[in-house]
């Protein structure tokens, strides 16, 4: 944005694991981060299954819950804590306490149905980001509330590493190619994105001003299927 305003021809690419850039359906790095988180949670599930535990896993998501939502659904989490799940006027601490109670209630419901192990996926905005509590603190408090042996794990920056998936490599190549083509034409002040499978570009200032919401179909699953 600053370089474009200074008159330097610039074309931006949407590169973030959070998938929270509104001008594009998909951001480079999101699929890789989701797969890293999913594989880690799958491995954590192996140990909680054999020891009849609950695992609370904190994933990245400071302002948007894309990783938590999609990874939580993909791994069959019993509860998913999203940054977007905040009531009007609610402080981060109040949200944390409310979500903690909701988790405990969900686990008790599962116990009554005969479940012996649980996975909970929490975005960092719910816990550590706002210095409300660590995921380990939450696990200890949930254990006291439910009597279920509960462990907390923060995946942290492993979500920013790893070998890129095919989807990320192809997305980066398609968008990068498009960026080079418009720069060769002397066009700048643009951001490249993907909409409905098509690569396109738009004004960089307009793109930065846009807001992106979580997809309603996945939110409907989150609300009604009982994750």
Which positions does each model-derived feature cover?
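Short Gly/Thr/Asp-enriched flexible loops that form oxyanion-binding sites at enzyme active sites
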Residues: 1-8, 68, 134
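C-terminal non-catalytic interaction/assembly regions of soluble proteins
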Residues: 131-227
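Accessory alpha-helical/coil subdomains and C-terminal extensions
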Residues: 30-148
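Short, acidic/small-residue loops that bind anionic groups at enzyme active sites
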Residues: 3-36, 81-85, 154
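Short, well-ordered, mixed-charge alpha-helical segments that flank or form enzyme active sites
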Residues: 18-22, 63-67, 201
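Structural motif
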Residues: 8-14, 53-57, 78-80, 116-121, ...
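Short, conserved micro-motifs enriched in small and acidic residues
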Residues: 27, 31, 62, 166-174
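Short gly/pro/ser/thr-enriched loop/turn and capping motifs at secondary-structure boundaries
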Residues: 16-21, 87-90, 128, 159-160
């Amino acid at each position: 944005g600053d370089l474009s305003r200074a008159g330097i021809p610039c074309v931006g690419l949407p590169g973030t694991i959070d998938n929270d850039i509104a001008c594009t359906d998909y951001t480079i790095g999101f699929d890789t981060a989701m797969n890293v988180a999913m594989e880690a949670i799958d491995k954590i599930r192996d140990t909680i299954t054999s020891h009849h535990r609950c695992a609370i896993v904190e994933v990245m998501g400071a302002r948007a819950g894309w990783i938590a939502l999609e990874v939580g659904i993909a791994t069959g989490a019993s509860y998913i804590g999203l940054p977007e799940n905040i009531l009007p006027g609610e402080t981060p601490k109040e949200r944390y306490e409310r979500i903690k109670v909701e988790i405990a209630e969900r686990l008790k419901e599962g116990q009554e149905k005969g479940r012996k192990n649980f996975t909970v996926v929490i975005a960092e905005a719910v816990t550590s980001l706002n210095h409300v509590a660590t995921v380990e603190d939450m696990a200890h408090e949930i254990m006291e509330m439910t009597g279920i042996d509960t462990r907390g794990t923060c995946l942290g920056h492993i979500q920013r590493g790893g070998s890129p998936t095919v989807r990320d490599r192809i997305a980066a190549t398609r968008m990068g190619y498009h960026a080079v083509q418009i720069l060769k034409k002397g066009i700048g002040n643009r951001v490249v994105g993907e909409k409905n499978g098509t690569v396109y570009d738009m004004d960089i200032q307009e793109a930065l001003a846009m807001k992106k919401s979580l997809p309603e179909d996945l939110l409907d699953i989150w609300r009604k299927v009982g994750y």
